[in-house]
Amino acid sequence: MRLDRIIRNSGCTITVGDAFVEIDAVCNDSRKVTRGSAFVAVKGYATDGHDYISIAIGKGAKAIIYEDQAALDRHVESMDLDGVTLIKAESSRFALAMMAANFYDNPSEKLTLVGITGTN
């Protein structure tokens, strides 16, 4: 799926690169990144996903979604970013949720909910 369709309504802005690149997967775990993936750097409670940006690029990520500009600069200053699109997110957690929904064609919209209420 094209990156511009994946980041739709996610609060993201492309800072460097191409919006029309094809993305094969969306990951927030650098161990699961494959060539053609988009990596979302999420700040966690124990670790910061920004610390794994260079690993994701090394594994072939085509897009990096980041929240912290200073952290991005620290990790990519000496790397070759040819073919990598950098995308700034207001909230990487929100961006990840919206990107996953877009990538998988909004599966929650296709669910049928049934509620049964009553007493006893």
Q: Residue ranges of each PLM-predicted region?
A:
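Walker A (P-loop) phosphate-binding motif
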Residues: 101-120
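N-terminal leader/targeting and accessory segments in enzymes
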Residues: 1-98
